[in-house]
Swiss-Prot record:
Region (Disordered): 1-25
Cellular component GO terms held in the UniProt record: membrane
Membrane topology qualifier: Single-pass membrane protein
Keyword Transmembrane among UniProt keywords: yes
Record's subcellular location: Membrane
Source species taxonomy: Bacteria, Bacillati, Bacillota, Bacilli, Bacillales
Organism: Bacillus subtilis (strain 168)
Name of the protein in its database record: Uncharacterized protein YqaD
TM helices/strands, residue ranges: 35-55
Keywords for this protein: Membrane, Transmembrane, Transmembrane helix
Length: 55
């Protein structure tokens, strides 16, 4: 029984570490997406500002 309990504990810790790594990876992906969106909005704002000044 002790070996079985130790094995379960090790598996549980391993699963927790995998979940943490996946969550960290998802957070990085979300950060990149948000950064791209913000930069795109700024570029479009500057583009339209200069375009509308011509009229």
């Amino acid at each position: 029984m002790k070996n079985n309990d130790k094995k379960k504990e090790v598996q549980r810790k391993y699963r927790e570490e995998i979940k943490k790594k996946k969550q960290k990876n998802e957070d990085n992906k979300n950060f990149i997406k948000e950064t791209i969106i913000v930069v795109t909005i700024i570029v479009l704002f500057i583009f339209f500002t200069y375009t509308l000044q011509g009229f």
